[in-house]
Amino acid sequence: MTTPTPPVLLRTAGELHARVRRGRRAVVMTMGALHEGHATLIRTARDIAGPDGEVVVTVFVNPLQFGAGEDLDRYPRTLDADLEIAGRAGADAVFAPAVDEVYPGGEPQVRVTAGPMGGRLEGASRPGHFDGMLTVVAKLLHLTRPDLALYGQKDAQQLALIRRMVRDLNFGVEIVGVPTVREEDGLALSSRNRYLSTAERRTALALSQALFAGLDRHAAQEALCARAREVPATQARAEALSALGESRAAADAHAVATSAPGSATAVRDAARLVLDDAARATPPLELDYLALVDPSDFTEIGDDHTGEAVLAVAARVGATRLIDNVHLTFGPLGAAS
């Protein structure tokens, strides 16, 4: 087994620009504290760029993304470990600039604004967060000059906003979304997971469990729609309900039985039941939001929605704030998606 070549550590824009370009350049932007989710992004970038291309990982804890009372000073900084993980995953270079390298004139007076989508969900909970995120992404795209940039789907709203910025401002870079990586028990990988105590981690599992409950509800409803074309509706509903399992509470089952096929309300309700239980746990889960939204603009969808949707959740467990989401597709009434 060959030992991977350590990535070149670059600290300044001059060092980055002095590198001779070869093939396609793929960039993976991180705030450090790398984990398997980041490694998956880097490996995917390596596969897309190919052996003749170049993979650059950025490590920069962006102060503009942290609001008052958030965890900027607490955010883990583990550059030596990051270099090792990035190298094993196939990175050629790691660009880890200081704050004054990215913002040489101090806090920038001109910023990218996230628009209406940036004020919803995460933006409502963290005012200014997405303006700061888009500003640093724009700067890093200019500095790294990639052909493509990869981002995790766990940060679904961030990914949607980056795609919108790249389109609206003609950046000429391909944006690639990579599916969320999870622990065996379903918890989405996050650099902030290391803050959780054993008890807090047990409570935090409710985020993914709630999303999976929503997916189960959605699958049952879509199966009901498909079967409705072939058998009486009453029989189809009974079969769909059985797919949810006998462990569901009676009230939970009743919600499916009385909701319209493809009902967004029923999907939300199934997820909320899990979160309500977690709110009574020790330690409790403090829900920030649960939303079922259109991925094009992150507005809430209604029961008549067809097409793609994102079921998203954010909550605090102890001092740690976590987010997660899943994607699903609603078919038209009476038809499978």
Swiss-Prot record:
GO biological process, one term: pantothenate biosynthetic process
Protein keywords: ATP-binding, Cytoplasm, Ligase, Nucleotide-binding, Pantothenate biosynthesis
Gene3D superfamilies: HUPs, Pantoate-beta-alanine ligase, C-terminal domain
Active site positions, chain numbering: 38
Entry annotated with the keyword Ligase: yes
EC number: 6.3.2.1
Amino-acid positions noted as binding ATP in the UniProt annotation, renumbered to this chain: 31-38, 152-155, 181, 189-192
GO MF annotations, alphabetized: ATP binding; pantoate-beta-alanine ligase activity
Pfam families given in the database record: Pantoate_ligase
Catalytic activity: (R)-pantoate + beta-alanine + ATP = (R)-pantothenate + AMP + diphosphate + H(+)
InterPro entries: Pantoate_ligase, Pantoate_ligase_C, Rossmann-like_a/b/a_fold
Residues that hold beta-alanine according to the record: 65
GO cellular component: cytosol
Compartment(s) where it occurs, according to its Swiss-Prot or TrEMBL record: Cytoplasm
Top-level taxonomic group: Bacteria
Pathway involvement of the protein, from the record: Cofactor biosynthesis; (R)-pantothenate biosynthesis; (R)-pantothenate from (R)-pantoate and beta-alanine: step 1/1
Broad EC category: ligase
Binding site for (R)-pantoate: 65, 158
Record bears the keyword Chloroplast: no
Membership in a protein family: Belongs to the pantothenate synthetase family.
Record's miscellaneous remark: The reaction proceeds by a bi uni uni bi ping pong mechanism.
Function: Catalyzes the condensation of pantoate with beta-alanine in an ATP-dependent reaction via a pantoyl-adenylate intermediate.
Subunit text: Homodimer.
HAMAP family in alphabetical order: PanC (MF_00158)
Name listed for the protein in its UniProt record: Pantothenate synthetase
Encoding gene, per UniProt annotation: panC
